[in-house]
């Protein structure tokens, strides 16, 4: 079987079974140990029987509902490879847009100042590690309630050479204890309403951690809790950045405006035209 034939089969088989037809490309890159460019340059190359067997097994497992990223053990985020397992949410492209928005606002708001930045809800460490690597002026902290998630993130920080301070705790509680004031708080909290959770794809619902996805009946529980805790840990001049669920922009904006009446609060749409981020800037 040639590379293009393997991809054609996988695309058709995945589509017939209601899965993303492009997943075959990710899997074949992993099996052949090449990047996408290498794959495209070798479309007419033969793959070995062993590679074909491995490839078809991965594809069948994905059709059964197992996320590709958990099978191959990583996801690419902001151009870097992050180890993932079922203790952490698989990083999404939308969160890369959150990173871009945060970095732009830090530069505009603070310039080259040394800052204390917290990512709340560590997961794989995608947000905290990326911020630490992209801007060396940031002292980055990250907090997660699940020690299992922290262990995954620590592994990623070590592999990628990022300096991040890890706290095991609930939301902003570690900073209440230490008295540390923060210049920037970033979070991609659980925001899926309980009812929507029931209708999610089995690929997500049966494998990714529910604690990282569901935010109460209306999906806004964690944002409400943030509003209670943020005023006690933020500097007067600060930035808050949230990823949100589709349709939650105005609700989260209202919550931030109530907590910080003088802040400039902005709902930002992602590349697909969906409200996906809310930023608050305090002078």
UniProtKB/Swiss-Prot annotation:
It is an enzyme of class 2 (transferase). Gene3D superfamilies: DNA helicase RuvA subunit, C-terminal domain, Vaccinia Virus protein VP39. Keywords: Methyltransferase, S-adenosyl-L-methionine, Transferase. CDD domains: AdoMet_MTases. Substrate binds at residues 188-191. Its EC number is 2.1.1.297. InterPro entries: DNA_methylase_N6_adenine_CS (IPR002052), HemK-like (IPR004556), N5-glutamine_MTase (IPR050320), PrmC_N (IPR040758), RF_methyltr_PrmC (IPR019874), SAM-dependent_MTases_sf (IPR029063), Small_mtfrase_dom (IPR007848). SUPFAM superfamilies: S-adenosyl-L-methionine-dependent methyltransferases. One of its GO terms (molecular function) is nucleic acid binding. Methylates the class 1 translation termination release factors RF1/PrfA and RF2/PrfB on the glutamine residue of the universally conserved GGQ motif. Belongs to the protein N5-glutamine methyltransferase family. PrmC subfamily. PANTHER family: HEMK METHYLTRANSFERASE (PTHR18895), MTRF1L RELEASE FACTOR GLUTAMINE METHYLTRANSFERASE (PTHR18895:SF74). This is Release factor glutamine methyltransferase.
């Amino acid at each position: 079987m040639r590379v293009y034939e393997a991809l054609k089969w996988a695309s058709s088989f995945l589509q017939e079974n209601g899965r993303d037809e492009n997943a075959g490309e990710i899997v074949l890159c992993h099996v052949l140990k090449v990047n996408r460019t290498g794959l495209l340059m070798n479309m007419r190359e033969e793959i070995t029987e062993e590679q074909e067997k491995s490839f078809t097994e991965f594809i069948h497992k994905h059709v059964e509902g197992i996320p590709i990223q958990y099978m191959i053990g990583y996801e690419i985020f902001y151009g870097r490879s992050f180890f993932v397992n079922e203790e952490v949410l698989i990083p999404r492209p939308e969160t890369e847009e959150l990173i871009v928005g945060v970095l732009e606002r830090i530069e505009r708001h603070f310039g080259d100042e040394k800052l204390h930045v917290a990512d709340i809800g560590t997961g794989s460490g995608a947000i905290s590690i990326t911020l630490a690597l992209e801007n060396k002026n940031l002292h980055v902290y990250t907090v997660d309630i699940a020690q299992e998630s922290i262990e995954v993130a620590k592994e990623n920080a070590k592999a990628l050479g990022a300096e991040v301070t890890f706290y095991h705790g609930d939301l902003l509680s570690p900073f209440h204890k230490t008295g540390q004031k923060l210049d920037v708080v970033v979070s991609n909290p659980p925001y899926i309403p309980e009812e929507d959770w029931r209708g999610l794809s089995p690929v997500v619902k049966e494998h990714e951690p529910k604690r990282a996805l569901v935010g109460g009946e209306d999906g806004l529980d964690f944002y409400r809790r943030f509003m209670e805790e943020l005023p006690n840990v933020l500097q007067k001049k600060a930035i808050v950045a949230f990823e949100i669920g589709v349709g939650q922009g105005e609700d989260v904006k209202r919550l931030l405006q109530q907590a910080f009446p003088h802040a400039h609060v902005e709902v930002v749409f992602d590349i697909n035209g969906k409200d996906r981020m809310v930023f608050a800037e305090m002078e």
